From Swiss-Prot:
Protein name: Glutamate--tRNA ligase
Keyword Aminoacyl-tRNA synthetase tagged: yes
Species for this entry: Vibrio vulnificus (strain YJ016)
Role according to the record: Catalyzes the attachment of glutamate to tRNA(Glu) in a two-step reaction: glutamate is first activated by ATP to form Glu-AMP and then transferred to the acceptor end of tRNA(Glu).
EC numbers: 6.1.1.17
Intervals of motif 'KMSKS' region: 240-244
GO cellular component: cytosol
Length: 474
């Protein structure tokens, strides 16, 4: 048997973190078993669906690298198939027409609540029975699935173990509305059957749907897939993760400067574990992943942990991979890397200081863009009269260099210290402010080497002009 999993979001909003984790788990399980992963868009809610949401889901999946083997399938393109299966159940007396109006059902529900009974649809209730008997062909009706009245639904959840629900707790589910459109629980079953889905991995909020769906599988004569229901994700305050906890959309994490590999690594550990290991390559995730290692307990989202992972991957990933994802952030700042050093070299130098790609983009502009002003605080502290001579000597030595290497630039700074009998800070900090425009950067000799001789010379001259003007206005 080929294992086949699916991710089946509804296009009513963005791809959120909980959905992304479900997609990741489904993708990993399929890959770990040499199986296939299907993407299905469950768009039967015609009032709330949007193409924008579909695009956001596809963009989020592609950004995470969760490529699908089949799909995306759209439920709205399969209505003929659903109606065929509804008609099959009607013909076999496993479904029936219900003519009870919404007003009548509300009235019956109110009676049940007043009598301290569990509110539910009851086909044998006198008022509902009378409405059905009085109806004529052509009157508006829904189609209800005839749920078994006796026995229980039992299934072995791969995360939670044995689950048993009595059929007496379930009423006759609507499977087709009065407008002719099929409902979620029915479409899901037909889709999973037609698409050969063997394992359904989804959130625990679907547990109540599962016994209903199992009864429909069996009524259709379809194989029942294996189920695994993942616990919810909580915010750091213990409440269910929501917008008030900050970013919950996958693409918001892209915008905030996270690498897909970091978010995937974080999400896989948000409920699944392999000993105490924290860092997992994609290959390790695939090789080690198993459903029975997923926790039954809810997991709390920890942004500090995600930041730590992101910093790890910025430092240790192939700079070409980091550059690929950094480009979007550079575009937002209109930084053109064609006019400067190789971006991979800059990433190697600056990356380990950054927790996000936003920070990285913020810190590398001076490699590619000239500036006409220095950071006010840094200039006030370091571009003073006392820095004039060290900068002048450094400028002369820099201009005289014939081989522009980090080693030679390091020697220039050392020679300035020796010649003027000053400490490293007396030239290092003024030089840093001169060539970067600010007071923080990696080793200034390495920075100068990447910026290039022409720009370094011009910036030191600009710093000297700044000092001269400052002294003149003193």
């Amino acid at each position: 048997m080929t294992v086949k999993t699916r991710f089946a979001p509804s296009p009513t909003g963005y791809l959120h973190v909980g959905g992304a984790r479900t997609a990741l788990y489904s993708w990993l399980y399929a890959k770990s078993q040499g199986g296939e992963f299907v993407l299905r868009i469950e768009d039967t809610d015609l009032e709330r669906n949007s193409q924008e949401a579909v695009d956001a889901i596809l963009e989020g999946m592609q950004w995470l690298g969760l490529e699908w083997n089949e799909g995306p399938y759209f439920q709205t393109q399969r209505f003929d198939r659903y109606n065929e299966m509804v008609d099959k159940l009607l013909a076999e007396d496993k479904a029936y027409k219900c003519y009870a109006s919404k007003e009548l059902l509300d009235e019956v529900r109110a009676e049940q609540e007043a009598n301290k009974e569990m509110p539910r649809y009851d086909a044998e209730h006198p008022k509902i029975k009378a409405a059905n008997e009085a109806a004529k062909d052509g009157d508006p009706c829904v189609i209800r699935f005839r749920n078994p009245k006796e026995g229980s639904v039992v299934f072995e959840d791969q995360i939670r173990g044995r689950i048993e629900i009595s059929n007496s707790q379930m009423d006759d589910l609507i499977i087709r509305r009065t407008d002719g459109s099929p409902t979620y629980n029915f479409c899901v079953v037909v889709d999973d059957w037609d698409m050969g889905i063997t394992h359904v991995i989804r959130g625990e909020d679907h547990i109540n749907n599962t016994p209903r769906q199992i009864n429909i599988y069996e009524a259709l004569g379809a194989p029942v897939p294996t189920f695994a229901h993942c616990a919810m994700i909580l915010g750091d305050d213990g409440a269910k993760l929501s917008k008030r906890h900050g970013a919950v959309s996958v693409m918001q994490y892209r915008d905030m400067g996270y690498l897909p590999v970091a978010l995937n690594n974080y999400l896989v550990r948000l409920g699944w574990s392999h000993g105490d290991q924290e860092i997992f390559s994609q290959e390790e995730m695939i090789n080690l992943f198993s459903l029975n290692a997923i926790s039954k307990s809810a997991s709390a989202f920890n942004t500090d942990k995600l930041l730590w992972l992101n910093n790890h991957y910025i430092k240790t990933s192939d700079p070409k991979y980091v550059a690929e994802h950094l480009q979007w952030h550079l575009d937002q700042k209109d930084i053109k890397t064609e006019n400067g050093p190789a971006i991979t070299d800059v990433i190697k130098l600056v990356g380990e200081r950054c927790n996000t790609l936003v920070e990285l983009a913020d810190q590398i502009g001076y490699f590619y863009q000239d500036f006409d002003a220095f950071d006010a605080d840094a200039a006030k502290k370091h571009l003073r009269g006392v820095a004039k001579q060290p900068l002048e000597v450094a400028l002369a030595k820099v201009e005289a260099l014939t081989e522009w290497t980090t080693e030679n630039l390091h020697q220039v700074i050392a020679d300035v210290c020796t010649d003027l009998e000053i400490g490293m800070g007396k030239i290092g900090m003024p030089l840093r402010v001169a060539v970067t425009g600010g007071g923080q950067s990696p080793s200034v000799d390495a920075v100068m080497q990447l910026i290039g001789k022409e720009r370094v010379v011009a910036r030191i001259k600009m710093a000297l002009a700044f000092i001269a003007e400052r002294e003149a206005n003193a």
